[in-house]
Amino acid sequence: DQDKVFKFFKKIKPELVNIAAARVGGIQANSNFKQKFIYENLQIQNNLIHGSFLAKVKNLIFLGSSCIYPKLCKQPMKESYLLSGKLEETNDAYAIAKIAGIMMCYNYSLNYKLNYQSLMPPNLFGPGDNYNLKNSHFFPALLKKIYLAKVKRKKTLDVWGTGKPKRELMF
């Protein structure tokens, strides 16, 4: 609700807004609920970025995602590779929303002389993470699969993908 966001920002007068909020999930969730991922992420971003502008917030940090880069992106990834190829189909709706947030920050900064920056964090994991095998991110799901294989004394492990993508991880 953009009006509530604006009223909240007007009341507390933040010097900096840090946007880490997003609907997130793994391959299965991103594939099955694309409409939710694009709609909810655009709503979150639009409300927070524009609400910050209306409340005269000068500094904003927007967290992007490595999924904004092309599916066949050269490794290691560089900022210049953004929009240089086709996105991964399984999470293109989420990626498009994140790209829109990046462009909003860029253009608010350009047009209004604000310090609205976009940062691309690595894949984060840790306490309180989602370890559900059906809708978690890659690394928490992998950790859970390894744990379950160990507990059940399995000799093999089912891991999706080719194994070629490189990932940065941070605990």
Question: What label would you give each PLM region?
Answer:
Residues K113-L114, K152-K154:
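Short helix-terminating capping/connector loops at secondary-structure junctions
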Residues A93-I96, M104, Q117-S118, N130-K145, ...:
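Substrate-positioning beta->alpha
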Residues D1-N130:
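N-terminal Rossmann-like NAD(P)+-binding domain of SDR-like oxidoreductases, especially those catalyzing
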Residues K10-K11, R23, R153-K155, R167:
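Arginine residue identity/basic-tract feature
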Residues S31, V151-K152:
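Short leucine-rich amphipathic alpha-helices used at interfaces
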